[in-house]
Amino acid sequence: MPKNKTHSGASKRFKITGSGKVLRERAGKRHLLEHKSSKKTRSLTGTVVVAPADAKKIKKLLGK
């Protein structure tokens, strides 16, 4: 049986920590920022942990 290929789109979007948590960037900060408040754009910075239900699927796509 051949190995499963890593999903290249998922590998660009998600990172797995040493403890096994899946991290992602927040959506909504690429463009059309003019009408969004400074408070909103600041809150969209940084990474967040993915929900456990989604993390299982993502790990499968990444071959972990």
UniProtKB/Swiss-Prot annotation:
GO BP annotations listed: translation
Protein name per Swiss-Prot or TrEMBL: Large ribosomal subunit protein bL35
Chain positions covered by the region annotation Disordered: 1-45
Domain of life (superkingdom): Bacteria
Database matches in NCBIfam families: rpmI_bact (TIGR00001)
Biased segments, Basic residues type: 1-15, 27-42
One term under GO cellular component: cytosolic large ribosomal subunit
GO molecular function per UniProt: structural constituent of ribosome
Organism expressing this protein natively: Streptomyces griseus subsp. griseus (strain JCM 4626 / CBS 651.72 / NBRC 13350 / KCC S-0626 / ISP 5235)
Entry-linked PANTHER family: 54S RIBOSOMAL PROTEIN BL35M, LARGE RIBOSOMAL SUBUNIT PROTEIN BL35M
PROSITE patterns recorded: RIBOSOMAL_L35
InterPro entries per record: Ribosomal_bL35, Ribosomal_bL35-like, Ribosomal_bL35_CS, Ribosomal_bL35_sf
